[in-house]
Structure formats: C-alpha cells, structure tokens
Amino acid sequence: MSHIRKEKQKMKVIYPDYLKQFQCSGKECPDTCCKGWGIQIDARTWKKYQEEKGSFGKQIRKNSNKRDRTLKFQEGVCNFLTKEGLCRLQQAKGAEFLCKTCREYPRHLEIYGEQKEWSLSLSCPEVAKLILTRERPIAWLAIEKDVESNYKGEVEEELVELYYKMREWLVEVIQEPTKPIAIKVAEAMALAHDFQKYQKKERKENWEEVEERIQSVWNRYQKENETGRLETKLKKFQGETELKNIYVGNYLKIFHEMEAIEEEFLKFVRQVEGNMGENKETIGKERRLIKDAKEQSAKREVFYQNLFLYFLSVYFVGGIYDGMLYTKVKLAVFSFLIIRELIEQKELKEGRWLREEETWKIAWQYARQIEHSSYNLERLEEELESKEAFSLEMMLYCVLA
C-alpha cells in the first residue's frame, strides 16, 4: 500500500438508515462481545495503556500481550470482563478509554477510496434483532465531512461509483416485494455472475466502456424479468432436494477446517450434518401441521431477505480491492443457504417453528464464527472463489430446492 501524506479533504460518509437505532442491551444481552476473538489494541490506545499510572496501570499491562498488542483472554473470555458481563476498563475510565475495536463494536468502518462506510455487525445479538426484524426497505444515508486521509488516489473514483451502482441494483432485486426470497437470491447471484465478466481488477480500460457493459447486463436482466424469460431459465434448478442435501451437506464440512470461535455453534453444525438425509418434502409436511404456518412463513421471508441484504451490503463494495465481486455475492448466498439449512433441520427435528430469538441466535452465532476470525473469512472466500462446488449451477440448485 502506498503511503501518501495526510491532507484535509472532503470525504463522503455512508451509513444504513438503521445505524443510529442501535442501543446496547448491556446486562440483558444473551451473550457478550468480550469473548471468542482476539482484540488488537490500536497504537494510540496502547500508548495510553502503557502510560497509565498506579495499580490500575499495572493491571492493564499484566493482562495485555506486548508482542502482538492484544488483550489477554482466559478460556476465550477477556480478562477485563466482570461476572456481571461488564467491562472493568469502561467502568473505571469510561468508554473513551477503550481501544478502537471495543469502543466502536458492533459498528464497523470500511474505507473505499475517498468514501467511508459504516455498518453494524450481525455478530451482535442486539444488531441481529434490529436487522433481521426490519420490515422497511433498506436505505443508505450520506454526509460529507472534512477529514484527514491518506487514501486519496489509491482506488479509482469511477470504480467505487460503479460498485455502489451495482450494489444498488442487486439490492433492488432482493427488495422486489412480490417474489419469494429464494427466487430473488437466485436472480441476484446470476446477475453478479454476469457483472463479474465485465469487471476485472487487472484490466485497465476506458471507464465509459466498462460502465456501458455493466449497464447492458442490468438492462438485459430487466428485460428478461419483464418477459418471464428469467423465470423460465431458473425453473430447471427448482425442486432438486436430493442435490441440495448433497451440496449443502458438503458445504457444512468447511466449518471443520475453521478456527473455533463459537463452540456451541460448531457443535450444532455437526449435529445438523447428521440430519441431512431428511428432505424438503418432510419439512413441508411437518410445517403444514402447525397452526400459524402462513403467518410464520411471511415472517421468515422477511428474516431471510434481511439476512441476505446484510451480507450483500457489508461485503460487496470491498470487491474494489480484489476484483472478486461475484465471490462477495456468493458469500451472501452461502450464508443464506447455511443459516436456512440449520434453521430448517432444527425445525424438522423438533417438529415446530423456531421462535424469532432462536433464529436470531443462529444468525449471530454464524456471523461470529465467520466474521470474528480473519482466517475463517479469508478461507471461506478462497473456497467460494476456487472450488467447483460453488459454481453458479450448483449453488442455484441449492437455493431453489
């Protein structure tokens, strides 16, 4: 990465319209954000911790790793977490004394060229509840700020704008109100597959030509959608339950190779692997016996739409740095498939619809397992990028089964 002298410049700051609705539930939280990941201390906070005087300063340094500037954990839990689930650092010195990660979580900042984008992490139980129950379409707000930045010129502005435009189109596909979520996920995946053909990181082309090609893909999608041709194309992938069971069963094996972040979640995944012989028809028969099945189905459509939108919106624009926009969408599809399968298999086994908070828990535990380990996230993206098991055709069979 090139180092450029910091200078004041106008920077657009983008955030989802629900960002400021988040409020930490504190003691009422069903879990804690102070376990299961390595919390690295930023340079400014590390210096402050090293200079802290008295017995409290000694306590901080005793519970910090000097080599990699991280907080020490015991059995996966931060040493500064109290029995009441509160942070001793914050209790003693206030929120401003915390390191950048602890101070901002579950808020997360990404920088795309000369733009900043804030999001909320699904790995937080309160965020999961906020995002997954949302009934209104997602919208992004933007403000301009004068900030110091050393990112000027690192990414072409045209590329960033193109990615935001493609994300806008994909979000439009997912938020179409009349189609089932599985159909919309399949359409978004096919659309991203075609976008990828015309956007390669290593190709230096006239931006107008690239934009025209991407626009032509979107225009073709709209035309095929209006004429019903798109629906016809997808029909051959529908109802293949046996194929879905084989493919998704294999997808679950990826978790065997991951760093363990959420032990309870990984144990649940292993249990589900043993139930993959059950088919979709059986699940359907079980559900028809449940009194409020129609109402529950409508709620679940909202849940899955919000789930997919989360992974799409958080990761897609990051493709400006590696050119892997299609892989970013496949990550959202993979997350949709795994969480849907885990929920359905648990419902099949127990013969009931899961309560909302149970589905939220599966989602935020999955997010922790993936997002709280850079190794796990990078490994998953490598698999999605390179393995035939994650081809467009195979994943469409899984989505539409």
Predicted regions: what they are:
Residues 1-56:
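General N-terminal leader/first-domain-start detector
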Residues 14-15, 83, 320-322:
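Short linear interaction motifs
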Residues 21-28, 137-142, 240-244:
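Short, compositionally biased low-complexity segments
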Residues 21-39, 72-108, 121-128:
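Local cysteine-cluster metal-coordination motifs and their immediate loop/turn environment
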Residues 24, 92, 156, 160, ...:
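Short, charged/polar micro-motifs that form catalytic or ligand-binding hotspots
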Residues 37-84:
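Membrane helical hairpin/interfacial module
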Residues 85, 93-194:
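Internal, well-ordered alpha/beta segment that forms a basic, Gly-enriched binding/recognition surface
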Residues 180-401:
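Hydrophobic, aromatic-lined core segments that form the binding pocket/scaffold
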